[in-house]
Amino acid sequence: SIYELRGANILCEMRFNKPYGKQSQDASSTGYLVKKGVHPSSDCQQSGQTGLLVKYPFPLIRLAELYLNYAEALNEYEGEASHSKIIPYLDKIRERAGIPALLKSWSKARYPKTSFTKDEMREIIHRERMIELSFEGHRMWDVRRWKIARQEFDQDVKGWDVSGQSVEEFYNVSGDMAQPQIVADRNFPNEKYALWPISITEIQKNRNLVQTDGW
């Protein structure tokens, strides 16, 4: 991973025998690091143990989220008839991120498409939202709202072999393919976890309240 901090590029190599590898105190368990949210004026290499951490107000809502909310609402309400209105808003987000427009990307897909069903557009919007708003505190709520929490969370966490010292070991290279490995077991044992229980204190206050199913 390369971080641009205070005008300098910092290369964070994650193999075991490297400074940011598993042997260090704060190493990544997956071999991945998150650049999003790191202020470019921060400096992890400045003298002293703590470095320089620049704090700033966390954006609770962004224009991109409003575009995504609008796109999702249009698709659910109007279906395919709304897609000519939805795509320009998704393209605004893509343009800002420096990636090709939606239809241009799909024209180069393995199975190219120029139009989508309501269900297909829903999947596209879900994916665009997951990518654009990643690490901003939305994902947990989105998968519950869409009722796909078990589908998304009932699977193991995969990453690179952080014990590997060579490139081949780290990326678990087999032939010409890198093979991520399981780094953590994760399961979603029951659908009840998609919803919060009502506090017993609140139920005691009002006996007419009915506890959430499963709790």
Give residue spans per PLM region:
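Acidic/polar-rich alpha-helix caps and helix-coil junctions
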Residues: 1-215
